[in-house]
Amino acid sequence: MIQQESRLRVADNTGAKEILCIRVLGGSSRRYAGIGDIIVATVKDAIPGGNIKKGEVVKAVIVRTTKERRRPDGSYIKFDENAAVLIKPDNDPRGTRIFGPVGRELREKKFMKIVSLAPEVL
């Protein structure tokens, strides 16, 4: 569960390393975001010479959360860290590589480009 002021690692090669959530999209009173949800975030840490600069406001989709999530078959999925992938306005990833596994929920929410770039889908 990601909320305002949550910090997430960036799981792609855009140049950003850490982002801070400033808004959960999907309704005026929506408080939490899970795997496959879109957030607005600001870049808190970036590598020098990257495409993304510190302080930039970006949109991102969450790919991993430490809070367990129950699936329709009764199983639970959780990860060791909170991570997100930066996206363009048309919901395609801004980077060309994805690092680490991503949740299967991304396939159900039509983020097929991220699913195809990911090394593992859990």
Curated annotation (Swiss-Prot):
Annotated InterPro entries: Ribosomal_uL14, Ribosomal_uL14_bac-type, Ribosomal_uL14_CS, Ribosomal_uL14_sf
Q: What is this protein called?
A: Large ribosomal subunit protein uL14
Subunit note = Part of the 50S ribosomal subunit. Forms a cluster with proteins L3 and L19. In the 70S ribosome, L14 and L19 interact and together make contacts with the 16S rRNA in bridges B5 and B8.
Q: Among its keywords, does the record have RNA-binding?
A: yes
Q: Which residues form a coiled coil?
A: none
Q: Does the keyword Cell inner membrane apply?
A: no
Task: Please name the GO terms of the biological process aspect recorded for this protein, alphabetically.
Answer: translation
Q: Give the organism, scientific name.
A: Rhodococcus opacus (strain B4)
Function statement: Binds to 23S rRNA. Forms part of two intersubunit bridges in the 70S ribosome.
Q: Which UniProt keywords apply?
A: Ribonucleoprotein, Ribosomal protein, RNA-binding, rRNA-binding
The organism's lineage is:
Bacteria, Bacillati, Actinomycetota, Actinomycetes, Mycobacteriales
Q: Which GO terms describe its molecular function?
A: large ribosomal subunit rRNA binding; structural constituent of ribosome
A cellular component term from Gene Ontology for this protein is: cytosolic large ribosomal subunit
Q: Which HAMAP family match?
A: Ribosomal_uL14 (MF_01367)
Q: What family name appears in the similarity comment?
A: Belongs to the universal ribosomal protein uL14 family.
| SMART domains associated with the record | Ribosomal_L14
